[in-house]
């Protein structure tokens, strides 16, 4: 007869009755000397550990419960925890961030608990709790997870998820070099799924493009994290009407009109951009 039909290193007798196994205390995980494991299923609780591994891995008998996939009740299966060097008997490690792949989303220079990408969140997302960039795309798992990107695929690195690039040649399409990619959003600490991070009515990619192409002697900047620069008129290309009222043409309207925020007369026709846009 086959005493171990499920090949889990635990014979049927012990799956039913552990009273004769030296070092085992009866009724550790069940009553009436029953371990609770199934003699014809190798991994009764489906936690990626064979029943025998769960029973014989420690000096004192059970390391984990072969009939309970999550011995410490922290939401992470015993096998997954052991696979990644966590403690299946310590529920507190669910809230830890071992690889420090959270992100300072509110920019207060402190990674608060809500900003961590905890071990439990790593489990839910299928990422490695000991590798801060599971897919190797240069963007931390926690940053990707928070913004709804895929921390298990490097393909989204070069995507422009919020379409906030700038069509500088005005051909109606965003070519690869015109995109403001998710990786560039990470490097600039902008929001990869929100086209205007600072809410100044200038898209992030537009601000980056014109900031990179400002005049050599220009000290002012266009910053996708500065919500005030969209209201400024760097090139002073507003206009005065016949009643002497000045009409400002701020940077956010330059994007709207597709004009150069550093040049008061983008098309060099002798009329200011603001006057042409309003008349």
What residues fall within each predicted segment?
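Extracellular calcium-associated, cysteine-rich motifs in secreted modular proteins
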Residues: 1-279
């Amino acid at each position: 007869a086959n005493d171990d039909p499920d090949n889990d290193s635990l014979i049927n007798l012990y799956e039913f009755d552990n009273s004769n196994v030296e070092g085992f205390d009866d009724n550790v995980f069940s009553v009436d000397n029953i371990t609770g494991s199934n003699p014809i299923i190798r991994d009764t609780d489906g936690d990626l550990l064979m029943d025998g591994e769960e029973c014989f891995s420690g000096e004192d008998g059970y390391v984990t419960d072969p009939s309970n996939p999550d011995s410490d009740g922290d939401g992470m299966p015993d096998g997954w925890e052991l696979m990644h060097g966590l403690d299946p008997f310590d529920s507190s490690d669910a809230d830890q961030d071992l690889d420090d792949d959270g992100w300072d989303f509110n920019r207060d220079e402190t990674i608060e608990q809500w900003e961590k990408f905890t071990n439990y969140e790593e489990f839910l997302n299928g990422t490695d709790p000991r590798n801060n960039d599971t897919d190797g795309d240069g963007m931390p798992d926690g940053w990707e997870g928070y913004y709804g990107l895929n921390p298990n695929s490097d393909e989204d690195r070069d995507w422009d998820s919020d379409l906030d690039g700038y069509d500088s040649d005005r051909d109606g399409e965003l070519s690869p070099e015109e995109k403001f990619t998710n990786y560039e959003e990470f490097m600039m600490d902008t929001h990869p799924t929100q086209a205007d991070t600072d809410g100044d009515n200038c898209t992030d990619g537009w601000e980056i493009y014109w900031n990179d192409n400002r005049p050599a002697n220009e000290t002012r900047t266009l910053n996708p994290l500065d919500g005030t620069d969209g209201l400024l008129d760097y090139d002073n290309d507003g206009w005065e009407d016949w009643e002497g009222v000045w009409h400002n043409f701020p940077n956010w309207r330059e994007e709207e009109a597709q004009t150069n925020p550093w040049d008061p007369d983008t098309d060099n026709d002798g009329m200011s951009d603001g006057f042409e846009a309003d008349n």
